[in-house]
Amino acid sequence: MSRFDTLFAQLQAKNEGAFVPFVTLCDPDFDRSFDIICTLADNGADALELGFPFSDPLLDGPVIQAANNRALNAGCSTEKSFRLLAKVRSKYPEIPISLLLCANLIYAQTLDKFYQRCAEAGVDAVLVADIPLLACKDYVTAAKKHGIQPVFICPPNADEKTVAGVASHTEGYTYLVSRAGVTSAENQSHAANLDTLVERLKAHNAAPILQGFGIARPEQVKQALTLGTSGAISGSATVKIIEKNLDNHPACLQELARFTREMKAATHV
């Protein structure tokens, strides 16, 4: 069983959901990013979703765009991102790690080489944000060749064909987007049909569903679980804490620890 499969089986046995924070690798720099990721893992994060910094991200709102820029300005490269991933995996051999990135970063290395490097660094799953289902075949093939689980986004306006396609291609977990638009902790509105989408995904035997976009408070984690999901992903709210404490690293780690504990506590059904 993969790390994600093992995690969801363990959580189900305990009647718990998953809390998965997202941060950008090397934000605000390599060493502080490692401390930040360790703080998340040590304070209850069930899995980690980590972003490769990119200068022109499609789905990212201003908070995560700023994180990308900080990492790039600190000299972060794909090379350094893989080094940081390997360091995290070495310290945390059990925690599931998913990568979120844009296709251009993969093209720079070729599909096969990129997924090989993911496997070597201990990555479990990869979500390529800008690859539609219609163009996913080569990515899925390369991922599976190297034991990486391909993850796809189910948008709130998904028709039946899209729901079926996401369910059939996604492994590890299914990323259910709360609403249309870009990531944001401020925009916490959710599409009205999410409960129906969850039912439709489950009818197609989709991988466990994690809801993302606009998840910033413990009660929203509880709401996600009430819909029938297996947990929630929080990106902008997590990254905002980093942004707020750029000049005070100890305070940043302290606030991230408290935030993670509170969000995780909300997953106890």
Swiss-Prot record:
Keywords: Amino-acid biosynthesis, Aromatic amino acid biosynthesis, Lyase, Tryptophan biosynthesis. Its EC number is 4.2.1.20. It catalyses: (1S,2R)-1-C-(indol-3-yl)glycerol 3-phosphate + L-serine = D-glyceraldehyde 3-phosphate + L-tryptophan + H2O. One of its GO terms (cellular component) is cytosol. InterPro entries: Aldolase_TIM, RibuloseP-bd_barrel, Trp_synthase_alpha_AS, Trp_synthase_suA. Pathway: Amino-acid biosynthesis; L-tryptophan biosynthesis; L-tryptophan from chorismate: step 5/5. It comes from the Bacteria. The active site is at E49, D60. SUPFAM superfamilies: Ribulose-phoshate binding barrel. One of its GO terms (molecular function) is tryptophan synthase activity. Gene3D superfamilies: Aldolase class I. NCBIfam families: trpA (TIGR00262). The alpha subunit is responsible for the aldol cleavage of indoleglycerol phosphate to indole and glyceraldehyde 3-phosphate. Tetramer of two alpha and two beta chains. Belongs to the TrpA family. PANTHER family: TRYPTOPHAN SYNTHASE ALPHA CHAIN, CHLOROPLASTIC (PTHR43406:SF1), TRYPTOPHAN SYNTHASE, ALPHA CHAIN (PTHR43406). This is Tryptophan synthase alpha chain. The lineage of its organism: Bacteria, Pseudomonadati, Pseudomonadota, Gammaproteobacteria, Pasteurellales. The gene is trpA.
